[in-house]
């Protein structure tokens, strides 16, 4: 996948730019418990002052909140989407196909993922552990990727275009009708998982380099 290095660099750059790199993993692990996360809880876990948490969240404009101002979604969400992400008998959701391949390694849990082909509506499913994917149905499942934009709203600029497809040919036919998307690429689900693993390594290295 020739675009992989560029997609990876853009993804990591977006996280650096909006300041979410250090916040992402603790937030995901709290959301994975299946309940809203207060800013106070997040500040305590990160050992950050409340003002720093507020400043980072202000930059991450895609963040979802409940009516009380608690966080209910950032990549992993309590609100229903097309990407079902089940862990420990809890039904959660993700913003896009790539999220479902990235998050198990970051939260240290195996997830059962189910969705639909973005072109045909056919069901797709797989099991994603921190280190591998299994039970891929259909076996030829594919994923669409685009170059992430340098924008605060990563959900709108990237996630909304990253889908599962029942097969590579089906995805390529869909892509032929969406050529206006910058850097649009179709890859196998295994290639997408590999990209996600590489993103995780970059993210965790960034976090460890900032740890006193």
From Swiss-Prot:
One of its GO terms (molecular function) is alkylmercury lyase activity. It catalyses: an alkylmercury + H(+) = an alkane + Hg(2+). Gene3D superfamilies: 3.30.450.410. Pfam families: HTH_15, MerB. The keyword Isomerase does not apply. Cleaves the carbon-mercury bond of organomercurials such as phenylmercuric acetate. One product is Hg(2+), which is subsequently detoxified by the mercuric reductase. NCBIfam families: lyase_MerB, PRK13239.1. This is Alkylmercury lyase. The lineage of its organism: Bacteria, Pseudomonadati, Pseudomonadota, Alphaproteobacteria, Hyphomicrobiales.
């Amino acid at each position: 996948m020739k675009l992989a290095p560029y997609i990876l660099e853009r993804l990591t750059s977006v996280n650096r730019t909006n300041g979410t790199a250090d916040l992402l993993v603790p937030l995901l692990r709290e959301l994975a418990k299946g309940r809203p996360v207060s800013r106070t809880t997040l500040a305590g876990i990160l050992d950050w002052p409340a003002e720093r948490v507020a400043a980072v969240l202000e930059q991450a404009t895609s963040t979802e909140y409940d009516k009380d101002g608690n966080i209910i979604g950032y990549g992993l969400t309590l609100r229903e989407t097309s990407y079902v992400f089940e862990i420990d008998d809890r039904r959660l959701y993700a913003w896009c196909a790539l999220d479902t391949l990235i998050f198990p390694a970051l939260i240290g849990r195996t997830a059962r993922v189910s969705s639909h082909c973005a072109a045909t509506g056919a069901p797709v499913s797989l099991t994603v552990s921190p280190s591998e994917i299994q039970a891929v149905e259909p076996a030829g499942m594919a994923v669409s990727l685009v170059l992430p934009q340098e924008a605060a709203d990563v959900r709108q600029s990237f996630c909304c275009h990253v889908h599962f497809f029942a097969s590579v040919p089906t995805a390529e036919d869909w892509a032929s009708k969406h050529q206006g998307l910058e850097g649009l690429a179709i890859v196998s689900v295994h290639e997408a998982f590999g990209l996600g693993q590489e993103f995780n390594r970059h993210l965790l290295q960034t976090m460890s380099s900032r740890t006193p």
